[in-house]
From Swiss-Prot:
This is Amino-acid carrier protein AlsT. Keywords: Amino-acid transport, Cell membrane, Ion transport, Membrane, Sodium, Sodium transport, Symport, Transmembrane, Transmembrane helix, Transport. Disulfide bonds: none annotated. Belongs to the alanine or glycine:cation symporter (AGCS) (TC 2.A.25) family. InterPro entries: Na/Ala_symport. Gene3D superfamilies: Amino acid/polyamine transporter I. Pfam families: Na_Ala_symp (PF01235). It comes from the Bacteria. PANTHER family: AGSS FAMILY TRANSPORTER, SODIUM-ALANINE, AMINO-ACID CARRIER PROTEIN ALST. It comes from Bacillus subtilis (strain 168). GO terms for molecular function: amino acid:sodium symporter activity. GO terms for cellular component: plasma membrane. The lineage of its organism: Bacteria, Bacillati, Bacillota, Bacilli, Bacillales. The keyword Cell membrane applies.
């Protein structure tokens, strides 16, 4: 029966990904050129913006919005996904993860700027995302509802099953904890957080992400430094394998590219339409500011966290064997001793659980787009908890396959939409660039963009940043 479901999922997934990679890279390159290599020219600017506070210290700050999206990004894709990519696609998959991220940073700027532009008020806070800019920018509420359903099901349900599946595997491998016990504990913790709303999501995200990411990066640096003589050889292997000069595992260069793209997109979410839901929550003076913040998020996720995992694994073996997290655990055990599996299990628990929390919020804001209803929201919360339990107990491969399918559908819709709305995002960017050239801290007003409609949040003379 499971093989039947695997086939049912893999056939449409393979078809979508066959073409999605070219759209992903093509649009990323288009945005990169159209916006003048914005992800490189404004790289330092991103760090300036990330520390800004909202006026009067009300609402969600730029950094808090960054942590919400980072909570979703920094999870299984960074540890399990990278290991899976290397095991199935070889070292070259890492190179294509870098390529997808580099061009995807421009896509992330566009989608997150649009999310800020078309956000709506929610009490003292804001909410928004692709569903909102599809309705307001394209006038297609029906498509917004389709996207809202997709992201609610995929992130709140499917992707959370992926996260808890990895948690259960890591805890079983390190401590031999019964998966039923893991499922119960995760269900209780998840319920406590998600019934607390946005404030509790923010609190958990900004606590877990910086601490665990910092520790993980330091360990990766230690591994690289202590294996510095082997490091140039690893880089050479990555490039040679990526370009087809050196085959390490079975399959051609096309397979390596697709595997790298899939795992990279699952981790950094550039162009997928997920991070814009976090970007919309921030109180900022200009929509482009969150575009830059989420662009930085893609860099942080792929070039820092994912790359750390890749080097940890490849300095251990260029042909690792095993499923996901077990590969990373074995590599760390080789580098830093017997306590490594314990560390990686705890790190995986915290990273993945923060992703569960961030993923939940993406679903919540889209439930509210479809219909503001406490009943439907509570039904969704119960469904999230049920999928947390399911993921803890289910098989490994079918969960990843379901994630790949839903991720592909979401990305396809969002990429088409942001391509159609890219001219609007470009005008917003030019407004920001003009003010920065004048030495100003940019403040956006909708009237500065002729013909701009449905950006009600930015129509006031004085913006509440």
């Amino acid at each position: 029966m499971e093989s039947f479901f695997n086939s049912l999922i893999n056939i449409p997934s393979d078809f979508i990904w066959k073409y999605l990679f070219y759209i992903l890279i093509g649009l990323g390159l288009f945005f990169t050129i159209r916006f003048g290599f914005i992800q490189f020219r404004y790289f330092i600017e991103m760090f300036r913006i990330v520390g800004e506070k909202p006026e009067g210290n009300k609402g969600v700050s730029s950094m808090q919005a960054f942590f919400i999206s980072a909570a979703s990004r920094v999870g299984t894709g960074n540890l399990t996904g990278v290991a899976l990519a290397i095991a199935t696609g070889g070292p070259g998959a890492v190179f294509w993860m870098w390529v997808v991220a580099a061009v995807g940073m421009a896509s992330s700027f566009v989608e997150s700027t649009l999310a800020q532009l078309y956000k709506v008020r929610d009490g003292e806070d804001f909410r928004g995302g692709p569903a909102y800019y599809i309705q307001k920018g394209l006038g297609a509420r029906w498509l917004g509802i389709v996207f809202a359903i997709l992201i609610t099901v995929s992130f709140g349900l499917i992707f959370n099953a992926v996260q808890t599946n990895t948690i259960a595997g890591a805890l079983d491998g390190a401590f031999h904890v019964n998966k039923i016990v893991v499922a119960i504990v995760l269900a209780v913790l998840t319920a406590f957080i998600i019934f607390g709303g946005l404030k509790r999501v923010v609190a958990v995200s900004q606590l877990i992400v910086p601490v665990m990411a910092g520790i993980y990066i330091l360990i990766a640096l230690f591994v690289v430094i202590t294996n510095i003589t082997a490091f140039p050889g690893v880089i050479a292997t990555i490039v040679k394998n990526a370009l087809g000069f050196e085959q390490v595992v079975g399959g051609g260069i096309g397979g390596i590219i697709v595997i790298g793209a899939q795992r990279g997109l699952f981790s950094n979410e550039a162009g997928m339409g997920s991070a814009p839901n976090a970007a919309a929550t921030a109180h900022v003076s200009h929509p482009a500011k969150q575009g830059f913040i989420q662009t930085l998020g893609v860099f942080f996720d792929t070039f820092i966290i994912c790359t750390s995992t890749a080097f940890i694994i490849l300095l251990y073996s260029v042909t690792p064997k095993g499923d996901g997290i077990q590969v990373t655990q074995a590599a760390l055990n080789h580098h830093i001793g017997g306590w490594a599996p314990t560390f990686i299990a705890v790190a995986m628990f915290l990273f993945a659980f923060s992703s569960v929390v961030g993923n939940y919020y993406y679903g919540e804001t889209n439930i509210e787009f479809i219909k503001t209803s406490k009943t439907w929201l509570n039904i969704y919360r119960i469904a999230v908890i049920a999928m947390v339990v399911y993921g803890s107990l289910s098989g490994f491969q079918i969960v990843w396959d379901m994630a790949d399918l839903f991720m592909g559908i979401m990305a396809l819709i969002n990429l088409i939409v942001i391509a159609l709305l890219s001219n609007v995002a470009y005008k917003v960017y030019k407004d920001y660039a003009k003010q920065r050239k004048q030495g100003l801290d940019p403040v956006f007003k909708a009237k500065n963009i002729p013909g701009l409609k449905n950006a009600e949040t930015w129509e006031d003379e004085k913006q509440e940043a």
